[in-house]
Amino acid sequence: YGGTPPFV
C-alpha cells in the first residue's frame, strides 16, 4: 500500500 520502506 506504499510507505517507507515500500510495504505492500
Swiss-Prot record:
Domain of life from the UniProt record: Eukaryota
What does the further note read? Contributes to umami taste and sweetness of the cooked fish.
Name listed for the protein in its UniProt record? Flavor peptide
Q: Taxonomic classification, please? A: Eukaryota, Metazoa, Chordata, Craniata, Vertebrata
